[in-house]
């Protein structure tokens, strides 16, 4: 009976998520300009980056910007709250939403202006309707953010299903991949590298770092081991989505400011066609992944919990000493996970510089890696829902 009930709740959540995805697919097919392929012949990774945050630049549609501005706003808020996590946890849901929406609108205005300016530069549209197009793109972004937010409450995995759908759509739009003209040996090498990368990602996602501690409530004769478990990469696939959205937004803002100032400066070094641009992104990915992981682990909160319930790490004293101990362990775990994920992303990115004629195929492989990583996270989230639904009646009594 309980099992039927828990599956019924899960089915309702999945059904709601499917409804959200139908709205997203419908909106992403509403073209607001009758032209296609603005980026078809250049900056393939720019399209990939935008598709990784739920956007689509194959055509200018309602959801072209995706969730990029929102994810970037989350980074800004996370950095502001990082110094004082206690105050951040005391904020109400409406306060958090208010800050997120304001910053999201500002970033969406910047990004929409850059995208439309690119269309004008390529003579796809006239500059007379730029304000209207910006309004549509910003409104579309805010609608998509609202859908993702509703999916967090009533669906599964928040923004991840939207990004997953965007990636699948992007893979099908990549027609060049199906016209390969490379040697069999090179193709086998690419496939083997892809499989190895996926296995490493799976290892990272399933690995845990465990810290044994003494539980004062565990008085049984056959004592089961008690430990604090952290994932090797606590940030998961969301760190890749956030780093890509921040990179795209920074790139857009720098180019936009240069255009407004009338500068003819060449910012090719910020693109993925340049090793400096790739290095900048890899460093950004490592730093943001580390910060997000530390934010999620929240060692100060865990140290306070141990101080209140009496549990301790032998021979560490409770309180500040426990917090310092947890911080040292958390730094090791978070840096390791962040660097490993960044290295997996760095290999295909630098490969595009060594074999430029295979850049589209390599980007395709990278999209596939990210797609599988997000799928793993979605699968784990579903298992978590089933676990908590199974014990929901007990948890509601005491929580």
Swiss-Prot record:
This is Accessory Sec system protein translocase subunit SecY2. The keyword Membrane applies. It comes from Staphylococcus haemolyticus (strain JCSC1435). Coiled coil: none annotated. Belongs to the SecY/SEC61-alpha family. SecY2 subfamily. HAMAP family: SecY2 (MF_01466). Keywords: Cell membrane, Membrane, Protein transport, Translocation, Transmembrane, Transmembrane helix, Transport. It holds the Pfam family SecY. It is found in: Cell membrane. InterPro entries: SecY/SEC61-alpha, SecY2, SecY_dom_sf. GO terms for cellular component: plasma membrane. Component of the accessory SecA2/SecY2 protein translocase complex required to export cell wall proteins. May form heterotrimers with SecE and SecG subunits. The keyword Transmembrane helix applies. The lineage of its organism: Bacteria, Bacillati, Bacillota, Bacilli, Bacillales.
